Amino acid sequence: MSFKNFKVVEKMIFGRGSFVQLDDVLAAQRKADDDFVVFLVDDVHQGKPLEARIPVKAQDLLIWVNVDEEPSTIQIDALTEQVQAFNGKLPVSVVGLGGGSTMDVAKAVSLMLTNPGGSAMYQGWDLIKKPAVHHIGIPTISGTGAEASRTAVLCGPVRKLGLNSDYTVFDQIIMDSELIDGVETDQWFYTGMDCYIHCVESLEGTFLNEFSKAYAEKAMDLCRQVYLEDHPEKDDKLMMASFMGGMSIAYSQVGACHAVSYGLSYILGYHHGIGNCIAFDVLEEFYPEGVAEFRLMMKKHNITLPKNICKDLPDETIAKMVAVTKSMGPLWANVYGPTWEEKVTDEMLTALFRRI
């Protein structure tokens, strides 16, 4: 039996107000006067107080990243070319400041600056051959676990799939709960539920082990304190839940919800957080206790999900979603084990999507 030898984030800073230390962290990477940093920042912060706090130097490149649509291989390739055109040398660091999508963009760009070809070539598992540029993740919304994960999820020409690699993992993260204050309620809920769903999929999966179980159980406990108890330190708790949920998946795998959500997102364009919630709400047969508790959380925060979005879609559209979802072999293996292909049929998935 072969055991995973996986990489974790090398350095991390946690605490309210810790964002102020970013300049010091970057100073350690700057060795020459012309060394530059690339800041990839969610454009929701443009013109807001956070913009003035970003430690951009004269030689640096700040790019406002729009993530209204899910990150795509086309977007990553364009951003990579923009960085290459800005300066003939490599940046000493790439900083991703935003939610999971923005952090995934930063991870992907840092990889593509050192690996030839287009990013679609590397969608899959362990296809990246060269280490990335030094890269830093700073979440301004919590839940996805992108700060801890070894993937950067992109919509490509064929499917939605991540650049899964040890080189994808951030070299440094800064977790400052001040930055997630004031996130709009629906977005706060959808993104946080990504963490909760990570935990359910990990704890109910065939890949479960004590490493994953320890992280998932604690992350789930923190999610309950945030979404059911409305704890006064909920921002700090959600930030740690997100990280620990991501760590749980590192030595396990996600499951049916993420597989179905990928099909929804790729074909219908739903963002990852809400896509997961829409999918999870119909997966009682897979995760009965998790779905029941999820609905309690929705009720407490007055969340209403879209319904019947797939009921009347053309058969060919459903077939495309089924194809994307069925292609997620490792996810279904975590649900059913090595014989998953016997159970995950086109008919089963078609019936599932028609209920959404």
Swiss-Prot record:
User: What Enzyme Commission number(s) appear in the record?
Assistant: 1.1.3.48
The effect of disrupting this gene, in the record's words, is:
A double kdnA/kdnB deletion mutant shows increased sensitivity to polymyxin B and bile salts.
> Which InterPro entries does UniProt cross-reference here?
ADH_Fe/GldA (IPR001670), ADH_Fe_C (IPR056798), Alcohol_dehydrogenase_Fe (IPR039697)
User: Could you give a GO molecular-function term held by this entry?
Assistant: metal ion binding
| Record text on activity regulation | Inhibited by EDTA.
Q: Which cofactor does it need?
A: a divalent metal cation
| Cofactor annotation comment | Shows highest activity with Mn(2+) and Fe(2+).
Q: Name one Pfam family in it.
A: Fe-ADH
What pathway does the UniProt record associate with this protein? Bacterial outer membrane biogenesis; lipopolysaccharide biosynthesis
Reactions catalysed according to its record: 3-deoxy-alpha-D-manno-oct-2-ulosonate + O2 = 3,8-dideoxy-8-oxo-alpha-D-manno-octulosonate + H2O2
* GO-annotated biological processes: lipopolysaccharide biosynthetic process
* UniProt keyword list: Iron, Lipopolysaccharide biosynthesis, Manganese, Metal-binding, Oxidoreductase
* Class of the enzyme per the UniProt entry, highest EC level: oxidoreductase
What PANTHER family does the entry give?
A: 3-DEOXY-ALPHA-D-MANNO-OCTULOSONATE 8-OXIDASE, ALCOHOL DEHYDROGENASE
- Additional free-text comment from the UniProt record: Kdo8N is found in lipopolysaccharides of members of the Shewanella genus.
Function text: Catalyzes the first step of the biosynthesis of Kdo8N (8-amino-3,8-dideoxy-D-manno-octulosonate) from Kdo (3-deoxy-D-manno-octulosonate).
Q: Which family does it belong to?
A: Belongs to the iron-containing alcohol dehydrogenase family.
Q: What is the name of this protein? A: 3-deoxy-alpha-D-manno-octulosonate 8-oxidase
